[in-house]
């Protein structure tokens, strides 16, 4: 599950061998446009009248942000339930301390945190678990193992892989998030000897902050060879 900059959420249903069963892009453009217009009015009001005049507008922006989080969380959990998912995997968000950045950036971070919390409550009611993985490089590394991605300057939802492949940035990140969860769950319960054997077969899984979907596929194949 990737809570991206371009789309409210990108969901991928994945098996432990890396097989992708379903995908879904969750987006509410109308609500985001409304929020964008409110933030624009706040900026103009602050320039013309100072900070004291935009408090009511800011409260309205926060309310719109919360409503967007509710809608997104509900859509995520409904999709997961419909696909028979057992676990919903998010990136771990570091929310300690003061969040810096523009109003838009602050609202985006608050919304991501709110979506995760609301999704967790909804998922538990439906018998699903929530898990979180390290977010480092999930978006910057291509899911196919080709290396760093280059964002499209004109369309930030798209990127180009090092091998020339064009792909959706948030979808690639969603694959990597699911893969890191399975890599951790596969390796963690194994005895040290078995884990070392698999890590020798697929060295990339030793460093979790750079693991991608392609590494899970290779790990699943190595596990099958060893089991055979």
Language model features: what each stretch is:
Residues 1-228:
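Positively charged, helix-rich recognition surfaces that bind polyanionic ligands
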């Amino acid at each position: 599950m990737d809570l991206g900059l371009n789309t409210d959420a990108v969901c991928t249903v994945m098996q432990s061998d890396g097989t992708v069963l379903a995908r879904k892009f969750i987006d509410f453009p109308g609500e985001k446009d409304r929020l964008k217009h409110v933030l624009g009015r706040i900026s103009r009001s602050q320039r013309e009248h100072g900070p004291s005049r935009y408090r009511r507008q800011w409260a309205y922006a926060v309310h719109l942000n919360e409503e967007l989080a509710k809608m997104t969380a509900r859509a995520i959990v409904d999709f997961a339930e419909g696909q028979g998912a057992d676990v919903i995997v998010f990136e771990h968000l570091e929310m300690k301390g003061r969040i810096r950045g523009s109003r838009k950036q602050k609202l985006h971070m608050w919304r991501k945190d709110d979506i995760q919390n609301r999704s967790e409550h909804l998922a538990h009611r439906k018998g699903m678990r929530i898990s979180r993985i390290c977010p480092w490089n999930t978006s910057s590394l291509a899911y196919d193992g080709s290396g760093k991605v280059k964002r499209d300057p004109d369309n930030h939802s798209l990127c180009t892989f090092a091998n020339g492949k064009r792909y959706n940035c948030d979808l690639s990140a969603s694959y990597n998030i699911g893969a890191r969860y399975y890599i951790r769950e596969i390796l963690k319960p194994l005895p040290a000897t078995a884990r070392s054997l698999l890590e020798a077969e697929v060295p990339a899984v030793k460093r979790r902050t750079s693991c991608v979907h392609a590494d899970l596929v290779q790990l699943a194949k190595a596990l099958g060879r060893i089991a055979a």
